[in-house]
Design a protein with these regions (language model features):
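Acidic-basic catalytic patches of nuclease active cores, encompassing PD-(D/E)XK
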Residues: 7-10, 21-77, 108
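Catalytic cores of nucleic-acid endonucleases
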Residues: 38, 99-153
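N-terminal interaction modules that seed assembly of large macromolecular complexes
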Residues: 71-89
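Residue-level detector of short, conserved catalytic/binding motifs and their immediate flanks
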Residues: 81, 93, 136-138
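Conserved catalytic cores of phosphodiester-cleaving nucleases, focusing on short active-site segments
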Residues: 83-85, 91-102
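Non-catalytic C-terminal interaction segments of nucleic acid-processing enzymes
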Residues: 146-254
């Protein structure tokens, strides 16, 4: 079941008028941009600042969550946790943020889940198939910005994000019900790589297919399972929403 404390997401969180003539977020607590000396200058880090400012901080201020904590240490991130949300009545959710940063402004109707990648020349399970991770939910992000490439992007360049909060267990259960348990996903991803194929459809499953990246373009050469986001939104516990400087609103359809 979806955590009860997140049901209020279904009501829009509007922006409040700024008496100075601009837009002041409903949940804008005292907040200042991080120092350039200390902030993570990677595209992922910059997107994290945007999410902290326009998503998590608003939810905290509105009482939808008690608090949020961004995990800074590399070991925690490698265990599949970027942000921890605490419910008003206690309890926590560990979120793994996944963003399509190399498809800025593309509004793709799908999302790619990593099955395998190359590490020092060896095939290694990707984040969807890796065992032992702490992830409870994925926060899938389709970002929009004033630029089309992630290199050198700043958090102020982002204009909005369309997000899908996805229950990891619900996703894996749905895949297993389609005959795509972890073992089969890994075998088919490895077979796709060995065969040198770039794409392979899945018989009887029009909402998903396999894609292998070109090793000449991407060093890790991931093999992904691509799933239509309309299907992802239909899974139990899934919730879509849009966050921007203008406010936070639900996305009931993609």
């Amino acid at each position: 079941m979806f955590p009860p404390f997140l049901f209020p997401f279904l009501r829009p969180v509007p922006a409040a008028p700024d008496p100075r003539g601009g837009i002041l977020a409903l949940s804008s607590p005292p907040w200042s941009a991080p120092s350039r000396r200390t902030e993570d200058m990677s595209a992922e880090g910059q997107l994290g600042i945007f999410l902290d400012r326009y998503l998590y901080s608003r939810l905290e201020e509105a009482g939808r969550i008690r608090s949020f904590h961004r995990v800074r240490d590399r070991s925690g991130q490698l265990r599949g946790t970027d942000v921890i949300l605490t419910a008003p009545e206690g309890g926590a959710l560990r979120l793994d943020e996944k963003a399509q940063l190399y498809y800025l402004n593309r509004d793709l109707p799908t999302f790619a889940f990593e099955l395998l990648f190359l590490r020092q020349g060896c095939l290694t399970p990707g984040w969807l198939c890796r065992e032992g991770l702490d992830t409870d939910r994925y926060l899938l992000v389709w970002p929009f910005a004033r630029r089309d490439r992630p290199k050198g992007i700043r958090w102020t360049d982002f204009t909005r994000v369309d997000c899908l909060l996805l229950d990891k267990a619900a996703l894996l259960a749905w895949l297993s019900g389609q005959g795509l348990a972890r073992g089969r996903l890994l075998r088919e991803a490895a077979d796709l790589r060995r065969a040198g194929e770039r794409r392979r459809d899945i018989p009887g499953l029009p909402d998903a297919y396999y894609v292998a990246s070109d090793p000449a373009r991407y060093g890790e050469a991931p093999v992904d399972l691509v799933i239509r986001r309309a299907r992802l939104l239909s899974l139990p516990g899934s919730l879509g929403f849009r966050a921007s400087p203008a406010g936070l609103e639900p996305l009931l359809r993609f």
